[in-house]
UniProtKB/Swiss-Prot annotation:
This is Large ribosomal subunit protein bL34. Residues 1-44 are annotated as: Disordered. The keyword Transmembrane helix does not apply. One of its GO terms (cellular component) is ribosome. It comes from Streptococcus uberis (strain ATCC BAA-854 / 0140J). Keywords: Ribonucleoprotein, Ribosomal protein.
Amino acid sequence: MKRTYQPSKIRRQRKHGFRHRMSTKNGRRVLASRRRKGRKVLSA
């Protein structure tokens, strides 16, 4: 049985990257809350 997590940089960026977060209202809300919390890394 193969593992479920098969890393891909492109897929990671497209699903969880900064530009993808900025493209939706809720994504911007995620970034805002992470800024508020003081996260060093905002997105993948």
